Amino acid sequence: MLIFGFHSVTSRLRQAAGSVRELYVDAKRDDGRARDLLALAAKFGIDARRVEVSRLDRMCPSRRHQGVVAIVESRPPVMGLEDLLDSIEGPAFLLVLDGVTDPRNLGACLRVADGAGVHAVIAPKDHACPLNETAIQTASGAADSVPYIMVTNLARSIDQLEDRSITVIGTADGADQSLYEAAIPAAVAWALGAEGVGLRRLTRERCDRLVSIPMAGQVESLNVSVAAGIVLYETVRRNRSADRA
């Protein structure tokens, strides 16, 4: 698998340097970011190859590599859902994605999840995007810091969360209660569907409750990563307010 760009490659070096097989850096880049990356690679015994940018362009046709490309081993799932839940200290904070098949949306959701301090992102194996090169690049390093757990049966996995007293709240247009009116418990999993489609019926039925994100303009829905940012950071805001009380 290829990963590219300074954020993604630096994160992989810090989180799993042993998975980096080859590292290529634009021979003409001698700025601070390039030097820092080379020093980090050397720290882990990785000898970067300085090559012409044309070679990087051939390796990465999108040409959004910023002068750095790495060939890495695909990382196997770190743990299953039960193991993840066992490892969480304190109230669980999770994001469930149902039907999100666009890798850029997945990457953006991972990035938001990392910023908000989410313990993991959960998605179904048969109705979701895998963690591919585009998702990793869009995540800007978050793919290495936030576990992405793909489960066989999402409805059953939601039941597992609820068995552990984790409240599952889904977002849905037209839900009776808005996000800003709803109580958000300490242990929560937010369930979001793809833009324009929303949560599948069975997923909706498994949620403890549904809330809507108020819309004041003409558009009918938000991009899933934008919606994720709204609900996750509203949760963070309330938790911090509760801590100060």
Locate each region found by the language model.
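Short basic, glycine-rich beta-strand/loop surfaces that mediate nucleic-acid
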Residues: M59-E73, A139-A143, P147-V151, P185-G193
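Active-site/ligand-binding-proximal alpha/beta "capping" segment
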Residues: I169-S225
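N-terminal positively charged helical leader segments and presequences
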Residues: M1-L84
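Structured adenosyl-cofactor binding patch, chiefly the S-adenosyl-L-methionine
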Residues: T10, G115, P130-A142, R201-A245
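A short acidic, often aromatic-flanked loop/helix-cap motif at beta-alpha or helix-coil junctions
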Residues: S54-M59, P76-V78, L154-I158, D176-Q177, ...
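RNA substrate-binding interface of SAM-dependent RNA methyltransferases
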Residues: Q15-G18, I46, S87-Q177
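Short beta->alpha connector loops at strand-helix junctions that form conserved
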Residues: E52, E73, D98, P124-K125, ...
